[in-house]
Amino acid sequence: MVDVFEQVEEELRSERYKRLARTWLPVLGVVLVVALIGALGWWGWDSYQSGRAGKAAEAYDRGMEALRDSKPVDAKAAFQEAAETGNAAYKSMALQQQAGLAVSDNRIPDAVRLFDEAAKASRDPILSDPPAFKAALLLMDTAALDEIERRLEPLTSDKRPLHAFAQEALALARLQHGKTKEAREAFVLLQLGQDVPDPLRQRAQIAVDAIDSGTAAALPAIVNAAKAAPQAPAETPAAAPAQQ
């Protein structure tokens, strides 16, 4: 009798397992398929991004070599390829190099546009702030003060990589537009700043002296010195970020 009960119980368990299998095996199969598709998709995307970065690096190197060989047409084509195929880092750097070529050809509006595109290519201030700063400098002599302030003020935060240079440029712009008091205050702060580069500190001292002595006509020389300060990245980074 006990054997009969055990046999019946075993059959019931077997039937229960069969029902569970019919219910959950299809669901489990779908989950496994989705997971597999996701893994393959990630692998494919990672391979695609790595391939793009490699092509962009090669194109960027060709552009730099063409610049060294004084072949601006070839350089422009190579940098264009790097900007189109590269990740955020290479796109930003390649656009900055194109902007530099435009400046050399005195195509200032094109240079400003390219610097703006380079600044928008990455959210990393290390990559975005230099082109944004250069675009503002190119507009110093032609744009309204409101436009210069709109471009430079975000770069003046203490946490931004070019904050001291942006503060100097903003002070120069205000001095150019007759806001002498505001400009002098900014230059004094630059003189006293702890992390201000020595050349910039010296220019701030010159500006304060010029304002105090009424010889602010020396301003163009100060502006030209400021424009020569930070340059766009030129060399290929050891490990450019995959995406920004």
Question: Where would I find each of the regions flagged by the language model?
Answer:
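Short, low-structural-confidence N-terminal segments
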Residues: 23-26, 32-46, 243-244
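Soluble extracytoplasmic domains of inner/organellar membrane proteins
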Residues: 89, 99-229, 242-244
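Short extracytoplasmic
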Residues: 55-96
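Flexible helix-coil transition and linker loops at the boundaries of alpha-helical arrays
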Residues: 44-48, 83-86, 120-122, 156
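N-terminal positive-inside, membrane-proximal cytosolic segments immediately preceding the first
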Residues: 1-34
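Transmembrane signal-anchor/signal-peptide helices with a preference for the extracytoplasmic
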Residues: 38-60
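Long, low-complexity, intrinsically disordered segments
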Residues: 234-244
